[in-house]
């Protein structure tokens, strides 16, 4: 499996050179932003790892070989489906982290009893951790009824371009199969994959009802397979790769570049 983009180009700088004289000192915004930027890339990397595993040929690592070719094919597909679902979870986590990445870059962490909390300047480690945890708790989806982003746009209008990017992305992404399948796996159950279902034995029985007036015959649900949420594993893996290449990476690249341009983080944070 080949991807178009190097995700590590999205990460914070691994090394920098700068003149100490006149260099901008880091503040909490810089630290929080770079921290979330790095965490986002780590989760993105995990998604890629499991995508690569969907094409593994190292099956002896996962189970002992069997003489039954049908059973062996089923094992391959079942494990590949687990790798796919794990990658699906990580990709969706990356999307959610992108909201936090934007939120913590803004010039306040949270409101306490209606008072704006200023997170500029340098903080003791314990205070900085507490502020970041507090900020993380405030993040919701960009279109949730009580989302913080409209308020952020009023308080920090310089961040409007970045906030609009995450809202526009979410409005499109939330209706895609990538998000719908993630929500199904997370909250509702496990999907059935057509490639695996084809290998299962046929149903034991079928129940049919005939309409005496029209003669129309209707099959009644009598097997658990009748009510499964089913789709193709191969097509889903391909769709996830295309989402990575053509949707997720370009969105994150633009978002990070936009925030960096607004925030101008200190070169001392890397």
What spans do the regions from the language model cover?
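Short linear interaction motif-like sites in intrinsically disordered regions of transcription factors
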Residues: 60-63, 100, 171
């Amino acid at each position: 499996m080949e991807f178009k983009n190097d995700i590590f180009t999205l990460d914070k700088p691994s090394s920098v050179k700068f003149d100490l004289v006149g260099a901008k000192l880091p503040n909490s915004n810089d630290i929080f932003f770079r921290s979330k930027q790095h965490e986002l890339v780590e989760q993105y990397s995990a998604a890629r790892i499991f995508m690569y595993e969907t094409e593994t040929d190292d099956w002896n690592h996962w189970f002992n070989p069997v003489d039954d070719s049908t059973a062996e094919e089923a094992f391959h597909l079942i494990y590949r489906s687990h790798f796919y679902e794990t990658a699906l979870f990580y990709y969706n986590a990356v999307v959610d982290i992108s909201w936090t990445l934007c939120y913590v870059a803004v010039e306040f962490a949270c409101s306490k009893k209606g008072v704006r909390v200023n997170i500029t300047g340098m903080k003791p480690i314990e205070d900085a951790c507490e502020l970041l945890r507090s900020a993380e708790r405030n993040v919701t989806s960009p279109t949730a009824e009580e989302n913080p982003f409209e308020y952020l746009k009023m308080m920090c209008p310089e961040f409007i371009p970045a906030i609009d990017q995450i809202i526009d992305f979410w409005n499109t992404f939330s209706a895609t199969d990538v998000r719908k399948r993630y929500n199904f796996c997370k909250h509702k159950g496990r999907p059935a994959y057509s490639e695996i279902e084809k290998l299962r034995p046929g149903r034991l029985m079928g129940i049919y009802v005939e309409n005496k007036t029209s003669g129309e015959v209707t099959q009644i649900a009598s097997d658990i397979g009748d009510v499964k949420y089913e789709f193709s594993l191969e097509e889903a893996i391909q769709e996830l790769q295309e989402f990575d290449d053509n949707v997720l990476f370009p969105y994150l690249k633009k978002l990070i570049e936009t925030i960096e341009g607004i925030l101008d983080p200190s070169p001392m944070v890397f």
